[in-house]
Amino acid sequence: MPVRLNYDLSCVRLRELGLLAHDNHPPMPERLPQYDDSEPLGFSIFRTLLDDALDLSDLTLPRTFFGRSQIDRVSFRNSDLHESNLCWNDFNGTDFSGADLGSSDMRASLFHNVLFVAANLDGADLRQSSFTECSFEEATMKHAILTRQQGAAMRLSETQRQHIDWRDEDGPEPGGG
């Protein structure tokens, strides 16, 4: 696995890609961000279209806020996005292979043709999201939260199924919807 850039160098990379203003160096939030958090905010993607095979691999961006955005053909391979908020988004052809999404809130999003190969999804809340043509091969999912109805439609290994925190209900709708 390639080495991840630290947070400061990840911000430099985001500036190079035009995703951060040159004078902006957002603080790293101390907890999972919410849609109604007050300033200062960490790095966030809100009501944005990210596409054109954008490469955001090998970055350290924990506690990032993604909201009401469309993420098409973007690579987050081997990126650290743990404790991020990925609610209310459309992810199409996105690659999270080897990424750390542990303890992230990923509810109420659409994931189509998304790779989670060898990703860390431990403790992530995936309820109210749909996963079509997604690969979870070798992904860790200890205590990941899914409904039994979702699980029936997903290709998961027996080990993954044993580690998931299965729920019968969708739970509360995430904020920001």
Which residues fall in each region the model found?
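Tandem repeat scaffolds
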Residues: 1-177
